[in-house]
């Protein structure tokens, strides 16, 4: 019998031959990206591959993930919905506003949302929050994973629009999308400084860690409004 260990609200470690990160499947019997389904005492879990998910990597890097089943999340850079689907599992009675710019990925997201009613796909540029402000309510957490050069600025723009006063920001900073020449550590330092000082609102950094060995040249950041 596999063993299940709760790591935080809605996030688990399933031990079956090896330890695997997992969430409870909100859509029983269905997979999203070829992940394994493991049933334990009548509950179906979906394994969560940290090499395909920045948020999954952050969990394994011991970030506090401030989500509950009722949380409302703005997800910037939703792509085809790999990580969005796990957030959907975690916030089973909440909502995930999934912003994605690529029409091909949006088709996948719409298909996912047809089976998971807490996912709300939004075809838009994450750098232009005014264009979707009528579609998003105040949120408890913003998760951002975008491959654009102005990543800190995008986070700040969305936070001032949508983040509750007591809310949190989880950000995956991709160094090579910002500067292909500078050392990643220099890029990370500059982006974190921007979050702390350059924009309104300003953020207090609670945690910042390199996401190796799961993702090269990426920094995970957990922050809250000052």
UniProtKB/Swiss-Prot annotation:
Residues that hold S-adenosyl-L-methionine according to the record: 82-83, 100-101, 125-126, 145-148
SMART domains per UniProt: Fibrillarin (SM01206)
PROSITE patterns, alphabetized: FIBRILLARIN
GO biological process: box C/D sno(s)RNA 3'-end processing; tRNA processing
InterPro entries on file: Fibrillarin (IPR000692), Fibrillarin_CS (IPR020813), SAM-dependent_MTases_sf (IPR029063)
Annotated keywords: Methyltransferase, RNA-binding, rRNA processing, Transferase, tRNA processing
tRNA processing listed as a keyword: yes
Enzyme Commission code(s) on record: 2.1.1.-
Keyword check for Metal-binding: no
Regions annotated as coiled coil: none
Pfam families in UniProt: Fibrillarin
Subunit structure: Interacts with nop5. Component of box C/D small ribonucleoprotein (sRNP) particles that contain rpl7ae, FlpA and nop5, plus a guide RNA.
PANTHER family: FIBRILLARIN (PTHR10335:SF17), RRNA 2-O-METHYLTRANSFERASE FIBRILLARIN (PTHR10335)
Protein name per the record: Fibrillarin-like rRNA/tRNA 2'-O-methyltransferase
Organism encoding this protein: Methanosarcina barkeri (strain Fusaro / DSM 804)
Lineage: Archaea, Methanobacteriati, Methanobacteriota, Stenosarchaea group, Methanomicrobia
